[in-house]
Amino acid sequence: MHPQVLIAGAGPTGLTLALDLARRDIPVRIIDQATEFFPGSRGDGIQPRTLEVFEDLGVLDAVLTAGSPTPVMRAYFGGEFAGQRRMADPVEPTPAIPYPNLWVLGQSRTEAILRDRRPHCPAAASSSSQRR
């Protein structure tokens, strides 16, 4: 199967696009300038709408298992404890908004989950991933 789409960038956006196209039987090829996968993180927050996309792609369970809700933060003023709270108050899901809260998961782990899903999508699995 020859790729019909070339995706520049093997980060979360490129991998998400590859999975979405592959499930539509559109073969892709992903290229990336990096020579290896970045082990750190450039972004840890996954937005609610992205969680909906991940559900649609079949990776949501892995993302929810690997990540966590936003952590509690503590504030200190003049060396004294002033209080603690979450970055945002949790919101209850509704049928219209099933995932209303930010989810915390490092980018390298998100990328690994998306890469692990590629073998389940023949059009993505048959494409080549070139890293230079």
Model-derived regions, located:
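A conserved short coil-to-beta-strand element within the FAD-binding core of flavoproteins
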Residues: 128-132
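N-proximal short alpha-helices
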Residues: 23-27, 36, 83-87, 91
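A short helix-to-beta-strand connector/capping loop
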Residues: 118-126
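Conserved beta-strand scaffold positions in the cores of enzyme catalytic domains, especially
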Residues: 30, 102, 126-127
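Active-site-adjacent segment of FAD-dependent monooxygenases/related oxidoreductases
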Residues: 42-119
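Residue-level detector of anion-binding/catalytic polar loops
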Residues: 27, 60, 124
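N-terminal Rossmann-like FAD-binding beta1-loop-alpha1 element of flavoenzymes
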Residues: 2-30, 35
